């Protein structure tokens, strides 16, 4: 799956919760964020490819990527036994829209939440949208996906 934008790319790299195949950067970008992403990618052994903006646009669903994209795999599920030790844990239920889910995660992280339990829903198809709408919070915040929410909280 493709993660778009500097904030999402940095969050995926720094959280280290999913495999990363490569990063593609607009060859005309030369700002601080881009320099950080390139340096961190080299440190982590991630391949960085420079490309024309048009090529990057063609790979994405829109043009809000800012010239930076990351190819990543599925996120590892956080362990429930570690999450339940948290002082501030939240159970989110009934959220279907990936943008709203991302906004909730961003607000929870800002409020000091240390973990989130959610029911099964295929968020993997929307991971890029969730990461972007959460401002990267979805990558940093421990999340446990429960098959049965009632059993998860007992």
PLM region spans:
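N-terminal positively charged helical leader segments and presequences
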Residues: 1-81
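RNA substrate-binding interface of SAM-dependent RNA methyltransferases
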Residues: 81-154
